[in-house]
Every structure is written in structure tokens, then in C-alpha cells.
A protein has these predicted regions:
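A membrane-topology feature that recognizes alpha-helical transmembrane segments
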Residues: 1-238
Length: 238
């Protein structure tokens, strides 16, 4: 049963991940620019979802790598969560999280069109999961985690706006809901892991003289990695 569950999650992740390069390319623009509507040769995007889903051959993230990454993320979540209701939530949110990481890594931007729906979806879907027998979390904990992590990052943004952006705080809303589902220890572990990974990356750049103190780094991928680690811990302990 577990092997089939993990295999199914991996197949879902691979299929969903194969559709992410196109939106990653289209959304990977500076804040003052519109979303891309054509490839570098000027050909308008066509295909599923009005050209928003699909590969981005020669002008975006490589499809095999993105599909593999998403498959591994989904498989790991299935292996640790098991056949519990919240696994459906994690598998639905995982491709969006991967997409956010791709965009932020590319242009240091976390678009509202992704972060806010992610937070809303996490809240609603976990509320539904809480109604299904066999779950291992708390919807109240998810709401508290959402407010705690989102509010915490908002404070960090206000203290150091050059180091983090409002996009990080908006992303933290959805991640806080997911981590808070498993309770305060997992919420704290995921939050600290994300901050720690970002700090280590920044320190490494300074040591290698590849960045200065004022250099902006994309925190989104590290926040996502921290939340992913927290969910693995929560799944194992649930």
C-alpha cells in the first residue's frame, strides 16, 4: 500500500511538474513588467489553460528537471504522511510551491497571483481535511500557524525591507498554515529551518565574495525548503 501510494504521488508530481516550466517562464518577470505572452521569437503561447501550462523549450526551466523535482517532493510527502487526508492537500499545493521557488530563484519575486491563492487554498483544504477521519493535525493549529508565521515575516520585512520583501510574508501565510497543522513544534522547526538555510546561503556568498551585505537573495526557495522539511517531520510524527 505504501509503495503504491508513493509511486502514485511520484507520478502525480511528474505530471504536474512537467506543466510548470511555461508558467515559470511567463511569471518570471520584474515587478514593473507584464507577464510574458510570447516566446523570445515572438510566437504567442498556446496550449492548455490558454497557454499557461506546458513546456518552455529553449526559454525556460528544463522540463525533465522540474518534473523530477516535483515528483521527488510529492513522493517524499507521501512516504512520510501516509494515507491520511492531509496528503491530498500537500499533493495539491506542492506543484504551486515548486513554481514559486522557480520564479523567485529566477527574478527574486513571489507573485501575489501565486502566494495569496496558496494561502487561501491551504486554509480551506486543511479545513476540509479536518472533517475527514484519520487526519493527524488541527485546523485551529493551521490558522494559528498562518497568523504566526505570516505576522512574524511581516515584522522581519518591516525591520529589514532590503533583506526580505512582502512576497516572503505572503508566502509565509500558506506555509504557516501547513506547518501549524501539525502543531507548534513542527511550525517552529520549519520556520527555523527556512531561516537557517537562507542565512547559511547568504553567509556562503559573503565568504566566497560573491555578494555584499546589501545584496538581495531570494528567500522563497529556503522558506519552501524549510516548510518541506517541517512537513516531513510532522508526517513522520503524526
Amino acid at each position: 500500500m505504501t509503495a503504491l501510494l508513493v509511486a502514485g504521488a511520484a507520478l502525480w508530481g511528474a505530471a504536474a511538474g512537467s506543466l510548470l516550466p511555461r508558467p515559470a517562464h511567463r511569471l518570471g518577470v520584474e515587478p514593473d513588467q507584464p507577464w510574458r505572452s510570447a516566446d523570445p521569437e515572438g510566437r504567442p503561447f498556446t496550449g492548455p489553460a490558454r497557454g499557461w501550462l506546458g513546456a518552455a523549450r529553449g526559454h525556460g526551466p528544463a522540463t525533465p528537471q522540474v518534473a523530477l523535482l516535483t515528483a521527488l517532493v510529492c513522493a517524499a510527502l507521501a512516504a512520510t504522511t501516509g494515507a491520511r487526508p492531509e496528503l491530498v492537500v500537500w499533493l495539491l499545493l506542492a506543484p504551486v510551491a515548486v513554481l514559486l521557488g522557480l520564479v523567485d530563484r529566477r527574478v527574486h519575486r513571489l507573485p501575489d497571483v501565486l502566494t495569496l491563492p496558496l494561502a487561501a487554498a491551504a486554509t480551506v483544504l486543511l479545513g476540509l481535511a479536518a472533517l475527514v477521519p484519520g487526519h493527524a493535525g488541527s485546523w485551529t493549529g493551521a490558522l494559528i500557524g498562518e497568523l504566526f508565521l505570516g505576522g512574524g515575516y511581516l515584522v522581519l520585512v518591516l525591520i529589514n525591507p532590503a533583506g526580505m520583501g512582502l512576497g516572503d510574508a505572503k508566502l509565509a501565510l500558506g506555509l504557516g498554515a501547513a506547518l501549524g497543522w501539525y502543531g507548534p513544534p513542527v511550525l517552529l522547526a520549519g520556520a527555523l529551518l527556512g531561516l537557517g538555510l537562507g542565512a547559511l546561503y547568504g553567509l556562503g556568498l559573503l565568504v566566497l565574495r560573491r555578494a555584499g551585505r546589501a545584496t538581495a537573495i531570494p528567500y522563497g526557495p529556503f522558506l519552501l525548503a524549510g516548510a518541506f522539511g517541517g512537513l516531513l517531520i510532522g508526517g513522520l510524527g503524526g
